[in-house]
Amino acid sequence: MCIRDSAWVGLTEDEAKAKGIAVRKGLMPWAASGRAIANGRDEGHTKLLFDEQTGRIVGGGIVGTNAGDLISEVALAIEMGADTVDIGRTIHPHPTLGESVGLAAEVAEGVCTDVAPPRKR
């Protein structure tokens, strides 16, 4: 059995839906993270949720090593009303687990070059 760290702040997808907020999701799998791969712990992910109307972050979660230590950037982004561009263009050191927050924002914005873009439905 594997016990992973997990942390969440803000709204979940279900909570946003219940409040009538359409969200855009940015999911960064740690299998594409150089630091997670180097640590041998690439089974996690970072997920950010952005309000479709305003572009502002409304929630985010991290599953993986040190998730509780990494979630503070997401909490600050929510408090500051950050959007995908604010988070994605913030310098994140490489290779770190924390850069997955910036990359998840880039995924939501559609500009991330580290993972394949999500399929259109």
Question: Which residues fall in each region the model found?
Answer:
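Flexible, glycine-rich terminal cap/loop adjacent to redox cofactors
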Residues: D5-R121
